[in-house]
Amino acid sequence: MKDYPEREKKLFRLLDQGIDTIENTPAQYQNLTFHKLFGYYGSKGIVLRKETFEDNLELRTNDGEYNLMAQLLSDNSHMPLRVSIFTGRTKGSNLYSVREFGNDCLLYTLDELLRYGDVLNIIQADERDRIVERKDVPLFDDKAFREAIINAILHNAWVEGNEPMITVYSDRIEIMSRGTLV
């Protein structure tokens, strides 16, 4: 350990304070509002009470500061999520489009990303073995896309300050989450 003082320092900090999570990591921004969160919950038929929602959703650290989860659920999360579309099969291909989502309540961002999947899912004609009718084939499976997006957001290592990355190529979609399964 003496040869690696940074690792030793990190290990002792981990043993003393535990693993950094979105619940115990203070938000980078403390002047947060939650109007959109109330609207989102209301649209699902769930009533949040202003007096208790912070405790019920565990939006504060033990020191009373807003935590990272509060920042993610606030009206401005300061966390952009980008969808990059390339014309070919690699990042060396021309960049066709970049669409930015986020900087919003993460629940709204998730809904927007899932709706954008409908735009991306181009129907292609499969002319192989055609007799009379051609077969319409979507670019990807809707359910698989939905599951991958939700997992990328849920399992992302938000405490490291990185967002999931979605890249669309001519033959596939890559959804990268900077986290691990718990």
PLM ranges: what are they?
Residues 1-182:
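Active-site helix-to-loop segments that bind/position phosphate- or nucleotide-bearing substrates
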